[in-house]
Structure formats: C-alpha cells, structure tokens
C-alpha cells in the first residue's frame, strides 16, 4: 500500500465505526495562543474533551503537525522529522477502553494485515493511579502476556499539567526485525531502533486535584495518535521515513538538483535535511506564514536557510529549493488543497528567501571566518548575536560551522544578548496581554458576549465584569480599567483593523472607551476611563464614536480596492501578507517578486479612485464558506475562516456576482458605498522584507486632512522659494542642482588641500624590501574622502600600497589601497594593522578599511613596516 491508500484506509475504517471525519486543523493553533504550532491531533478538540462542546461524540482525523524542538537532529537520525501527519481517533464521553483497543487491533491486523507477531503493547503498571488492569485484560484477548509490557508514569501515564484531566495510556510497538542491538533480550524498552512505537492510545479517565489526589472524571475520553510516517515505514518494510514514498520523490529530485547520489553519510544527511525542510516549509507557507525574524516566521526562515546551507555544502551555487515545490504539490496537493491552490505563491516566497539568504550567507560566513580565526575554543555569544542582528545570520548555522571547526558556541551569552535587545524593544502592552489572557481564560465560559456593531452604533447593555488597571476582577470601578458587556457595538481590534472608541453612560457617571480588543474568541474587552462608579451587573448606555468608525471604514474599504487593483495590475503573484487599518491611515502588505514600477503604482491608485468615483455599492452578507470558491472570493493564504463566513462585495449585489469589482472574506467594518471614501491617496510604497512590500495610504476624511496639511506645507515652501505652488518642484530641483554643484566644488577644494599637505596632512613615501609605501594622515577627512584620496594617490603611485588614516577622538579610521603595480594584499595588511592595535578591518585584496585605537603616528607607521 502507498501512503495515500494507508491514510485513506485509516479515515474510512473509523468512519465505519461511527466516527465523524474531521479535516485537519491549521498548523497555527486557533484556540490556544500559548502554542507555536499544532503538534498533536487532539489540539482542535480541547473544548470537546472538556465537555464545553457537545456537538461531536466520535471523531477521526489526519492532522498536520509541526514539532521544532529537534531541528538540529533532522538529517542525522532515522526518525526525526519537523513536519508529520498524525492519524487519530477520538471519543468524547462515548466509546472507551475496550472498543479503542479492539478497533486498533482490528485495523492493524485485519485492514492492514500486519502480522500479529510483529506487534507488542505496553500498559500502565501503576503508581500515582492503580495498575491498568482493564487494558491488560482487553489486550490479553489479542496477545500473549509475554508481549504485554508494564511501564510507569514516564511512558504510560498522560497528564495535561500538574492538575486536571489525566489517565493511563497504552502504546503499540512494531518490530522492525533483528537489525538493532541484536541482543537476545532486546525488547520495547530498548532504544536500538528495532521496536518502534507506532500508536499511542490515551484513556483520559481521571482528574488530578491540587492536593495530588486522583478522582474519576464524569466524562471519560479517548485520545489516540499514530504517526503516518511510522505506519508507512512498517507497511513498506523500510527502516526510515525517508525511505518511504512520503519522501522518496522529493529525495530523487533533490539528487538531480544537488548532483549527488546519496550513498555516503554526508550526502544522505543533506538529502534528508533538504527533503524534510522543504516539506515543512511548503506546509507552513500554505498556512500564510512568511519568513521573518520572530515566532513562526523565524522557524520557517531557519528551516529554509538550514536546507540551503547544506545544499551549498554539496556544491549548489544558487537557489534550488523552490524547484522542489512542484514535487511536494504532486504528492500532497490533492489531499491538502491549500498547497495546490497556492503552489506558485509558495514557490515565489521560497525563491525570494533563497536569493536573500545567499547574499546573507556570503557576508555572514566572511565575518564568521574572521571571528573563528580570533577565537580559541569558544565563539562568544556577543559575536554570534552580532552576526544574527547585523547580517541575519542564524545562530544555528554559526553553531554548526563552529562545531565543524572544533569550536563551541557560548549559547548562554548569546541568549543574554538577544534578551537584552528584546528588552529594549518590548512593550508593556505585550507583557500585559499575557496577563489578561491568563485571567480571562479562567472565567471565559461565563463571559460570552454578542457583537451588534454591524447593525447598531449604540445599544443598552449589561456589565458582566469589571477589572481594575492591574487586571484584578472588582465589583466597582472608578478610574482606568476594563469591562466586558453582554452585547456591544464596539468592533474589537482584529483582522488588521483597530478597535472602535466611544463611551458608556449611566445615571450617575460615564466612561470613555479608548479601544476594544478580543483576547479570546468569545470576549470583547473594553479599555475604559471611568468618571463616577461603574458596577458589575449594572445597565448602561453604550455608543461608539461615529466619526472615528466612518474614517476607519473608509480606510478599510480602500484597502479592498487597492488589493484588487494590485492583483489586476501586477498579477497572480500578489497575495495579502498583512494589513493595518485605523481612522488616520492604512497599510497594506503584499507579496511581490519585484518592486512595482511608478507606472504600475499610478495605475493601481487610478483603478481604486475610479471605483470611488463610480459610487459602487458595498454589500456584506453571511454565507456558507463553500460559496467563496463559487463566487471567486479573495481569501488570505492560511487563514482559518468561520463557517458561515462574512463576505464583503464591492460593485455588485450577490445576485449578480459577475459584475463585482472585488469580493473578500472579511469581518471588518466598511462603508455602504465607495463614494463615501472620497479619494484614495498613496503616501509611500517600499520593501518591507524579502519578497514583501508595503503600501501606506489614506482615504476618506483622513485623505482630506492629509491634503490640507500637505497643501499648507507646500504653500509655506512656495513662499520661502518665492515662487508659485505650481513651480515649486522645478524650483526645488534648481536649488538641489546648485547645492550638488557647490558640494562637488567643496569636495574638490578639500582634496586639493589634503593632498597638498595643508590642514595637518602628512604624506610620507618609503620603500621597504622593494615595496613602495605611501602613508598619509588626513586630518578632518571623512570616510568617503579617505577612499577618494587613496584612489587618487594610487593613480600617481602605480606600484605602491597606500595607507591613509584619520583620527576621531580615541578611534582611528584607516584605508589601505593596493595600486595596480603593487603585489601587497590590502586586506591582509589592514587586518594585520587592526589585530595589533585593538581594532577590526575587512575588505578585498585591492581595497580594505578598518578602525583601531589611536596611537602615536610614528608607531602606526612602524607597525605597517613590520607587517610588510
């Protein structure tokens, strides 16, 4: 059986047992912000396990998972992977231990026809809870007791945490044959690789209390997990997932691209790293994640760059990973349409990151080589952080290269340097939001509220809870704090749009609302400043600021107009990568392989403003998610939408979708007609990161304000320049040309003064061992002038090496230039000077520059001669 057949057989088997087939959830956990990635099948079912969602009783999934704790091990072991698929069947207060065990055995031995002699199991032997006699007796119906092993808490007892749901588990092991330690006593407790756990069945039947006692749960659950990769290994009778059909197509194509056979150890590791990391990268990008230096984006960047470095070590000179995307699509695109639908986009993102990294690698490796030469046993964390911060050079690569050179990396001091840098930029709000989350999670089930802001801008509401500015729940509040209401017209910050502001009022007081946010999916939290006393349980009048809402709505609908215009002008490569919408400005981030031309940008804003002039209706409807494809709606890559979802159509009604200007799935607030936008103005456009660009603009009332401010500034400039508004650009260009000519004349005069020996300049000519040296101390010269002087002198002295320096406080800057007829290496001389004078230097054979501490000038010249 191939992997597709095995995956389908698992889902179909448990469907026949009454389980609902549930699609894989996103790799980005939607209901648990504490997780970086989805790493188990049960993550999407937390509410079902806790009894909060009773819509499902039995379920079966094939869940996409990413685990990144062992990235450095991938490629060097038979088992480690970063992306994997977890097959799982679940019960929420429905079937329990006997059925779970019987069905697992039936599936493995009858559906897959795995020989029973290949299978072993383990049960919980007892400890904090009693021995799992039930599981033991159920397994005895299928296996002799010699094949049932009893293990402790570490292997066979699952807990959610120090308290809460927990229970014993039973693991199923597959015997891969006598290829491990070959010890006659080898069994499932041996880590030689012969016995591999393929399925874990968790029996969640207890609740652990604060005092450590364990009591039965009222709802007993089943949570199982079986790695598809390991199961396919067993079915295809191979020793590693990299030998299964989940990887072999990618590895075979990688062999061609890397021009290696994969027969020696280093080549095998490279192929495994490349095939694993490209697979993970494709899935992550299909979820809307982009390479960055933080969070999930950093993991993605790390995977791409690690694969690239090993490709480079194999001899590759340029980007190659993006060429493997089509192989991943061929094998997984049918099962996971988010890959097939975004194949070109994924390839473009990876190629852009590859191009950026090859530049980074060249610069970073050169600097790292200098650091390695100066390091004895350990590379300092400060140096590693310098490479990371300045060149984007991953610390993991620094560590791997250092180890290959026999050096260690001081990871502790690296983390310290990184932490200090983060402390400088960390906002109090980021830390405070974590505190909010912890408090609200404890009481969220009693705080469900309703958003009515699409239909109303004011309403009567009941105060559910109030919290003070320290985020402590109180009965009454005066001054700053927070409130949750039973219903609210306040749009909470989300989807790139800033939250509403407005006010609460009641008989004896009022509260200004500065913003609303949504820390959990069912809670809108209002930040308030109370005059009087706001009481829990009280009835209040709630109203948003209508002008602020109108300005924000104009900017948000303008973003939709720009998005559609970009897609039409630039093409399919455009995908939304982020957005920010407030009352005063909008920002739109989009993917693009190249910068748009000025003509393209002009066309984009012309299209958007034509849509404004045509006074298109803007219609919003809640519709089934499946309508998105039917109607041609634009969706965000990787976004997990509710079903039903909110559709925003510009230019037509839903009965005539072919007439539309644009259609997106969006939960934000919008104008009713594009004429309310008035105009859309570009403020600036530029690169945000590799392959991602940003447009900043204004629309509506904010655009009018922007035009007023700029007209006022232009009028003031016209007055200063003594010209008309219309002639300001020409007059400014004329002034700039005059300034440029004056600067050029000043630079020429300065060079003449410097080379003429005035102003403290000292020029010296020496010949040592047949090598001609021209040295100069150019007081007051800037770095650009140093280079110009060196170039000028090298033309006059074609067989010399030129050294020019300038002192600035306690530091000396210098350049070294090798004239055409000289055989002295400028970079070697510069680094030698820096090394002897507590400095640093770099460059190439013909030109180098550096800095060092100030010493006596004659001592400096003496050092040059010693080095030559």
Curated annotation (Swiss-Prot):
Residues noted as binding Zn(2+) in the record, renumbered to the chain: 556, 560, 666, 670
Catalytic activity line of the entry: tRNA(Ala) + L-alanine + ATP = L-alanyl-tRNA(Ala) + AMP + diphosphate
InterPro entries hit by this protein: aa-tRNA-synth_II/BPL/LPL, Ala-tRNA-lgiase_IIc, Ala-tRNA-ligase_IIc_anticod-bd, Ala-tRNA-synth_IIc_core, Ala-tRNA-synth_IIc_N, Ala-tRNA_ligase, Ala_tRNA_ligase_euk/bac, DHHA1_dom
Cofactor: Zn(2+)
Compartment annotation: Cytoplasm
GO molecular function, one term: ATP binding
Keywords: Aminoacyl-tRNA synthetase, ATP-binding, Cytoplasm, Ligase, Metal-binding, Nucleotide-binding, Protein biosynthesis, RNA-binding, tRNA-binding, Zinc
Cofactor: record remark: Binds 1 zinc ion per subunit.
EC annotation from Swiss-Prot or TrEMBL: 6.1.1.7
Top-level taxon in the UniProt lineage: Bacteria
GO biological process, one term: alanyl-tRNA aminoacylation
Pfam families, alphabetized: DHHA1, tRNA-synt_2c, tRNA_SAD
Cellular component, GO, one term: cytosol
Alphabetized CDD domains for the sequence: AlaRS_core (cd00673)
Function per UniProt: Catalyzes the attachment of alanine to tRNA(Ala) in a two-step reaction: alanine is first activated by ATP to form Ala-AMP and then transferred to the acceptor end of tRNA(Ala). Also edits incorrectly charged Ser-tRNA(Ala) and Gly-tRNA(Ala) via its editing domain.
Entry-linked NCBIfam families: alaS (TIGR00344)
HAMAP family referenced in this protein's UniProt entry, alphabetically: Ala_tRNA_synth_B
Notes on the domains: Consists of three domains; the N-terminal catalytic domain, the editing domain and the C-terminal C-Ala domain. The editing domain removes incorrectly charged amino acids, while the C-Ala domain, along with tRNA(Ala), serves as a bridge to cooperatively bring together the editing and aminoacylation centers thus stimulating deacylation of misacylated tRNAs.
Entry similarity comment: Belongs to the class-II aminoacyl-tRNA synthetase family.
Protein's name according to its UniProt entry: Alanine--tRNA ligase
């Amino acid at each position: 059986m191939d992997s597709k057949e095995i995956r389908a057989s698992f889902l179909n088997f448990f469907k026949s047992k009454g389980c609902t087939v549930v699609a894989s959830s996103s790799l980005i956990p939607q209901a648990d912000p504490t997780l970086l990635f989805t790493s188990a099948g049960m993550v999407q079912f937390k509410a079902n396990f806790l009894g909060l969602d009773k819509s499902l009783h039995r379920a079966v999934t094939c869940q996409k998972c990413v685990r990144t704790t062992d990235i450095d091990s991938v490629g060097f072991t038979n088992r480690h992977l970063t992306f994997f698929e977890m097959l799982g069947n679940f019960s929420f207060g429905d079937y329990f231990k006997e059925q779970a065990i019987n069905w697992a055995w039936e599936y493995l031995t009858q559906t897959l026809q795995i020989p029973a002699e290949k299978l072993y199991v383990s049960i919980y032997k007892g400890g904090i809870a009693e021995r799992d006699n039930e599981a033991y007796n159920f397994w005895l119906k299928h296996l002799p007791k010699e094949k049932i092993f009893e293990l402790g808490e570490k292997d066979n007892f699952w807990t959610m945490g120090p308290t809460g749901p927990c229970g014993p588990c039973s693991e199923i092991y597959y015997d891969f044959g006598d290829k491990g330690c070959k010890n006659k006593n080898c069994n499932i407790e041996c880590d030689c690789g012969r016995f591999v756990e393929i399925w874990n069945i968790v029996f969640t039947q207890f609740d652990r209390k604060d005092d450590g006692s364990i009591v039965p749960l009222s709802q007993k659950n089943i949570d199982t997990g079986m790695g598809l990769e390991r199961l396919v290994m067993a079915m295809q009778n191979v020793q590693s997932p990299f030998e299964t059909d989940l990887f072999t197509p990618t590895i075979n194509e990688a062999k061609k691209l890397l021009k290696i056979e994969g027969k020696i150890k280093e080549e095998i590791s490279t192929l495994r790293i490349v095939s694993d990391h490209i697979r993970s990268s494709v899935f992550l990008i299909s979820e809307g994640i982009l390479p960055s230096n933080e969070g999930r984006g950093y993991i993605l960047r790390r995977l791409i760059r690690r694969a690239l470095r090993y490709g480079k070590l194999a001899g590759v000179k340029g980007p190659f990973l993006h060429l493997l995307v089509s192989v991943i699509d061929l094998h997984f695109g049918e099962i996971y349409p988010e890959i097939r639908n975004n194949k070109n986009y994924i390839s473009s993102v990876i190629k852009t990151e590859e191009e950026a990294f090859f530049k980074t690698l060249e610069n970073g490796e050169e600097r790292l080589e200098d650091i390695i030469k100066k390091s004895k046993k350990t590379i300092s964390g400060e140096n590693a952080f310098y490479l990371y911060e300045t060149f984007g050079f991953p610390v993991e690569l620094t560590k791997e290269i250092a180890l290959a050179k026999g050096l260690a990396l001081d990871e502790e001091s690296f983390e310290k340097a990184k932490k200090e840098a983060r402390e400088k930029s960390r906002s109090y709000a980021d830390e405070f939001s974590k505190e909010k989350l912890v408090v609200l999670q404890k009481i969220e089930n009693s705080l469900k509220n309703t958003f009515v802001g699409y239909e109303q801008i004011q309403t009567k509401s009941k105060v559910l809870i109030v919290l003070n500015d320290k985020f402590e729940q109180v009965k009454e509040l005066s001054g700053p704090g927070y409130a949750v209401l039973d219903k609210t017209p306040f749009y909470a910050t989300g989807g790139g749009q800033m939250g509403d502001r407005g006010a609460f009022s009641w008989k004896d007081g009022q509260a200004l609302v500065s913003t609303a946010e949504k820390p959990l999916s069912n809670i809108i939290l209002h930040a308030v400043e109370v005059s009087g006393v706001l009481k829990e349980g009280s009835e209040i009048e709630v109203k948003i600021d209508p002008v602020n809402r109108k300005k924000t709505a104009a900017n948000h609908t303008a973003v939709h107009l720009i998005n559609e215009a970009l897609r039409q002008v630039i093409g399919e490569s455009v995908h939304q990568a982020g957005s920010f919408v407030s009352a005063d400005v909008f920002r739109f981030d989009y993917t693009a392989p190249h910068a748009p031309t000025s003509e393209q940008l002009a066309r984009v804003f012309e299209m958007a403003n034509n849509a404004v002039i045509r006074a298109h209706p803007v219609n919003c409807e809640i519709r089934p998610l499946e309508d998105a494809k039917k109607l041609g709606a634009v969706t965000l890559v990787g976004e997990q939408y509710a079903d039903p979802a909110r559709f925003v159509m510009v230019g037509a009604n839903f009965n005539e979708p072919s007439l539309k200007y644009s259609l997106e799935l969006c939960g934000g607030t919008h104008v009713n007609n594009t004429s309310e936008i008035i105009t859309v103005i570009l403020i600036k456009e530029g690169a945000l990161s590799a392959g991602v660009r940003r447009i900043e603009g204004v629309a509506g009332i904010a655009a009018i304000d922007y035009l007023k401010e700029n007209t006022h500034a232009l009028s003031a400039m016209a007055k200063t320049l003594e010209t008309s508004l219309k002639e300001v650009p020409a007059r400014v260009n004329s002034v700039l040309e005059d300034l440029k000519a004056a600067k050029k004349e000043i630079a020429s005069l300065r060079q003449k003064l410097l080379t003429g020996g005035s102003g403290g300049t000292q020029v010296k000519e020496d010949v040592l061992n047949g090598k001609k040296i021209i040295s100069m101390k150019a007081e007051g010269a800037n770095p650009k002038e140093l280079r110009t002087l060196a170039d000028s002198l090298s033309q006059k002295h074609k067989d010399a090496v030129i050294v020019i320096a300038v002192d600035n406080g306690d530091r000396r800057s210098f350049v070294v230039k090798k004239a055409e007829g000289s055989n002295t290496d400028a970079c070697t001389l510069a680094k030698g000077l820096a090394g002897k004078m507590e400095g640093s230097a770099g460059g190439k054979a013909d030109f180098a520059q550096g800095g060092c501490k100030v010493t006596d000038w004659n001592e400096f010249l003496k050092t040059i001669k010693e080095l030559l």
